[in-house]
């Protein structure tokens, strides 16, 4: 939680829900006929708010007061101070659960998954996460190489996570790749895959947890190199084809258990 108390002060400014991610959530939830959703590690509640606007009742669980204090209120959202590993909710308190780029921050993700299963029973679980096997192919690591170690040490492999969810739930588990739009509005780590200039913006970097864990010297050197490569045209020479693409598979995945 200390990490998100540190980076969370301006989190809501850059980490806004993206409609394409939200619509994919709606599509996945539609088959479950759930009406009450628990959003675990809800942050500032951007996706809780998105679902509430579409008629869902949402229980948003978030341990960081810094995050909760930035949340936009909604009559269909109930905010709860709590940790994923010990959810302050009764058995079958919700019919489905979402975990949006939060699982890798849980102290004990396996205990958290057991708690999720307790709270939703046989209901649907949707995890939005990242495939750590993809990180070495992302050009951003050429400027900030510590991203590789951070991602590989914090994200769980997709196959392992899928197998663990299946073992806990007994439900079918589907992995759905999410191709990140070039104009993503939720500024998580891959927001600038086709817009490298975004990473020069301190506000963007401040909303990305991986940057908070990188040494300041590496960040300064990486930003300087990226700025120089953009000014000289070197970045466009090597990666400029990305600017022409509307979507790109950087490695983000929805894991759906139903």
Regions found by a protein language model. Give the residues of each.
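A short glycine-rich, Lys/Arg-flanked "PGG" loop and its adjoining helix->strand segment in the class I
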Residues: 110-123
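Conserved Class I S-adenosyl-L-methionine
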Residues: 174-258
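Short catalytic micro-motifs in class I SAM-dependent methyltransferases
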Residues: 101-102
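Class I SAM-dependent methyltransferase SAM/SAH-binding core
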Residues: 38, 44-86
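Conserved class I S-adenosyl-L-methionine
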Residues: 1-38, 46-50, 67-70, 125-156, 186-187, ...
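Short alpha-helix
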Residues: 153-169
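A conserved beta-strand element that flanks and buttresses the S-adenosyl-L-methionine
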Residues: 98
């Amino acid at each position: 939680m200390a990490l998100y108390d540190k980076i969370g002060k301006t989190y809501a400014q850059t980490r806004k829900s993206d409609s394409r991610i939200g619509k994919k959530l709606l599509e996945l939830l539609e088959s479950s006929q759930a009406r009450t959703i628990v959003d675990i590690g809800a942050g500032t509640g951007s996706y809780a708010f998105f679902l509430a606007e579409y008629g869902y009742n949402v229980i948003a669980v978030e341990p960081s007061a810094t995050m909760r204090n930035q949340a936009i209120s909604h009559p269909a959202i109930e905010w709860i101070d709590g940790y994923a590993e010990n959810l302050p909710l009764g058995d079958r308190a919700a019919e489905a659960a979402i975990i949006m780029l939060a699982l890798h921050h849980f102290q004990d993700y396996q205990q958290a998954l057991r708690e999720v299963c307790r709270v939703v029973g046989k209901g649907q679980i949707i995890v939005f996460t990242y495939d750590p096997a993809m990180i070495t192919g992302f050009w951003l690591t050429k400027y900030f190489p510590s991203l590789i170690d951070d991602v590989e040490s914090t994200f769980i492999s997709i196959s392992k996570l899928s197998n663990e969810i299946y073992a806990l739930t007994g439900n079918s588990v589907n992995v759905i790749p999410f191709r990140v739009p070039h104009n993503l509005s939720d500024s998580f780590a891959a927001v600038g895959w086709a817009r490298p200039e975004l990473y020069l913006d301190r506000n963007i970097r401040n909303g990305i947890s991986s940057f908070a864990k990188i040494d300041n010297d590496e960040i300064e050197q990486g930003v300087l190199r990226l700025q120089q490569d953009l000014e000289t045209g070197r970045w466009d020479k090597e990666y400029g084809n990305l600017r022409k693409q509307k979507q790109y598979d950087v490695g983000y995945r929805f894991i759906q258990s139903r």
